[in-house]
């Protein structure tokens, strides 16, 4: 059964069990919640055209796999105190959550920011498997993917096998993403 389980705003609020999980992290409005809905084939996550709507960690069960939708980073129109709070619990979750076995960084294919590059650098320091997922491939020409892929590969020495291409909106390649999630968790 595909379902929303719970929200959390700190590590102590997270589900307290030993089930393995993966998380989706990315800038605000990059499509993380849309990906959740696409993987579930149902609207179990709230989506919005307004960036910064997800301000909690949201736990879902999809195809018997636990997936956590993390708040987006980089949105400028929330209070500084709220930004700091989100940043703190994201850091706490990524560094200390024992259930976390995989991180999927969701990037907008057309726009790679310095903050995205910093997050990739952070992922390389964690003892958790990670993948870079370029979303919105339906919106951009192939040249955008080639340019941004090269930017990531060159700047960070990331292996190409860590990169996935999807369109959450059109559900393109979501099956490949789900297979990778299952592989990471098992």
From Swiss-Prot:
- Which SUPFAM superfamilies does its entry note? P-loop containing nucleoside triphosphate hydrolases
Molecular function (Gene Ontology), one example: GTP binding
- Cite the binding residues for Mg(2+): 33, 54
Key words of the record: Cell cycle, Cell division, GTP-binding, Magnesium, Metal-binding, Nucleotide-binding, Septation
Q: Which GO terms describe its biological process?
A: division septum assembly
What InterPro entries has UniProt attached to this entry?
G_ENGB_dom, GTP-bd, GTP-bd_ribosome_bio_YsxC, P-loop_NTPase, Small_GTP-bd
> Pfam families in the record, alphabetically?
MMR_HSR1
One GO cellular component this record assigns the protein to is: cytosol
Cofactor entry: Mg(2+)
Task: Output the PROSITE patterns linked to this UniProt entry.
Answer: G_ENGB
Binding locations of GTP: 26-33, 52-56, 69-72, 135-138, 166-168
Where the record annotates domain EngB-type G, the positions are 18-186
What the protein does comes down to: Necessary for normal cell division and for the maintenance of normal septation.
Family assignment? Belongs to the TRAFAC class TrmE-Era-EngA-EngB-Septin-like GTPase superfamily. EngB GTPase family.
Name of the protein this chain belongs to = Probable GTP-binding protein EngB
Gene of this entry: engB
